[in-house]
């Protein structure tokens, strides 16, 4: 096989109903300098046979069968096998949009990362698109402008590794964290951003993210989900701290801490605690939550480090809902001044 431009890594687990659509979306691309690495992660349906069928008829398809280890292990196995100059991740229940690969490689120089957009499909019906505002290369001293111009505008673009190209040499030894089962793909993206020095953005939706109506379910309010968030957050915060240290003149990175760590994850936990009883709710857990809020420079009351004590007292007095409402009010007031 000639040297390929892109290695497309597809983890597969019990995807017999969507895998053909996924693979045909790649075969329908005009751009053809790619290999497709199918990592069958212990499927118990017909997915294994589908993978073998494609790899037996097209040399660009490579199939690896392994015992079920999870999506991160499957992606890592694909990374270890990749030969392309760039690697790309595609989930087996999603699809590439028409001309996706052409749009991704058009205008590419030697950037470490290419960031495209995605379209959401709910029960097959096209919905919103999330994509960069313009085609722009951020290199050298301009790399920090990527964060200034993009990190808040559409921060959802950085939640997942798909709709992106990663230079394989830049990836190096970076791998998905196999100890986590929540947001490990987000950590991969931010670790790449921490170690990279150039990004190309393209203003096109290149990836189709397929969802079913109501597929989010009720798991996001379970104690198990809260535990997963607690395992993920310290690693995410460490990466944000690295970016803050590397780019001290980009305040929007700290704003992301305010909006994402505090406004998204911590307030979700507190609101769950305010609505129902939980075995996780204790003084130690709240001390951890409020210590992270204390680190939020956007709220003066927490920069004075008085966030923990009164809220722990409110917890003991069974006044946690009041505490959460007070924090939410202060947070909105703070954001309105920025």
Task: Locate predicted features.
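N-proximal low-complexity "stem/linker" segments adjacent to membrane-targeting elements
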Residues: 1-27
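Catalytic core of nucleotide-sugar-dependent glycosyltransferases
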Residues: 204-213, 219-248, 267-296
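A conserved acidic beta->alpha catalytic loop
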Residues: 25, 40-49
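Short aromatic/hydrophobic "clamp" motif used to bind/position activated sugar donors
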Residues: 87
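Membrane-interface aromatic/basic loop that binds lipid-linked glycans or pyrophosphate carriers
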Residues: 271-338
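Donor-binding/catalytic cores of nucleotide-activated saccharide
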Residues: 71, 92-200, 207-227, 248
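Short beta-strand/loop segment that forms part of the nucleotide-sugar
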Residues: 33-42, 62-67, 91-92
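Glycine-rich, basic loop-to-helix element that forms the pyrophosphate-binding segment
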Residues: 66-82, 103
């Amino acid at each position: 096989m000639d040297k390929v431009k892109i290695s497309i890594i597809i983890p597969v687990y019990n995807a017999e109903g969507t895998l053909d659509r996924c693979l045909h979306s790649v075969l329908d691309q005009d751009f053809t300098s790619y290999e497709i690495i199918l990592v069958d992660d212990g499927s118990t349906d017909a997915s294994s046979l589908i993978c073998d069928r494609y790899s037996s008829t097209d040399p660009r398809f490579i199939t690896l069968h392994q015992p079920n280890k999870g999506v991160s292990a499957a992606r890592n196995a694909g990374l270890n096998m990749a030969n392309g100059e760039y690697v790309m991740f595609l989930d087996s229940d999603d699809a590439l949009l028409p001309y996706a690969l052409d749009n991704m490689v058009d205008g590419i120089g030697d950037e470490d990362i290419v960031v495209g957009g995605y379209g959401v499909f709910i029960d097959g019906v096209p919905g919103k698109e999330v994509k960069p505002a313009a085609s722009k290369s951020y290199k050298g001293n301009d790399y920090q402008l990527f964060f200034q111009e993009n990190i808040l505008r559409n921060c959802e673009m950085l939640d997942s590794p798909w709709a992106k190209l990663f230079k394989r040499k830049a990836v190096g030894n970076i791998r998905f964290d196999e100890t986590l089962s929540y947001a490990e793909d987000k950590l991969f993206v931010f670790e790449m951003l921490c170690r990279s020095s150039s990004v190309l953005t393209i203003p096109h939706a290149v990836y189709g993210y397929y969802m079913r109506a109501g597929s989010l379910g009720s798991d996001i309010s379970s104690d198990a989900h809260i535990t997963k968030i607690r395992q993920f957050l310290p690693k995410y915060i460490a990466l944000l701290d690295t970016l803050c240290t590397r780019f001290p003149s980009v305040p929007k990175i700290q704003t992301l801490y305010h909006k994402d760590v505090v406004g998204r994850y911590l307030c979700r936990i507190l609101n769950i605690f305010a609505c129902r009883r939980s075995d996780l709710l204790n003084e130690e857990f709240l001390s951890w939550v409020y210590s992270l809020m204390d680190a939020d420079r956007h709220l003066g009351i927490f920069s004075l480090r008085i966030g923990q004590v009164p809220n722990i007292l409110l917890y003991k007095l069974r006044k946690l809902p009041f505490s959460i409402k007070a924090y939410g009010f202060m947070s909105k007031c703070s954001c309105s001044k920025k």
